[in-house]
Amino acid sequence: MVLIKNSFKALMVAHVFILLGFIIAGVSTYYFSQQLLDPFWWMIFVGLGLYLVYIPFNSIFFDRLIAAFSMKGNAGFFIYVADSVGYIGSVSVMLAKEGMSLQIKWTQFFSQSVMILSFVGVFITLYAMYYFTKKHKASLVATAS
C-alpha cells in the first residue's frame, strides 16, 4: 500500500482487504460447519481471514483515513482504542469460560462467532466504503467551489 500515493484510494484498498478477510473467514467456517473443509485447513483459512482484517485495520486504515480527509489526529490513538476493544472481547470470552459454568463446545462457539462476526463485518465494511466514498465526493465538491 506504500505504492499507492492517493490516500483515499489506499483507504479503499484497505477496505477491500478487510472485506476479503471477513469473506475468507466466513466462507471457510461455513464449509467447515458443513464438513466440506478439513479442520486443519479451516484454521489456516480463518487465521488468514482474521489476519487480512486485523493488519490493514490496525496499520493502514487509520493512517490513510486521517490523510484522506486532511484531519488532524494521531493514528496511534485510534489503533490503541481499536486494540483495546479487541482485548475487551478476548478477556470477556475468557472470563465467561472460566467464571461461569457454561456447558458449551468451544469449537461450536468459535465457529458460530466467526460466522456472525464475518457476516456483520462484511456489512459494516461495505457501509464504511459507501460512507467514506460519499464523504470524499462531498469534500471534493466543497473544495472545487
Where are these regions (language model features)?
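Extracellular/periplasmic helix-loop-helix junctions in multi-pass membrane proteins
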Residues: 31-40, 95-112
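Intracellular juxtamembrane helix-capping segments at the cytosolic ends
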Residues: 52-70
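C-terminal transmembrane helical hairpin of 12-TM major facilitator-type secondary transporters
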Residues: 6-55
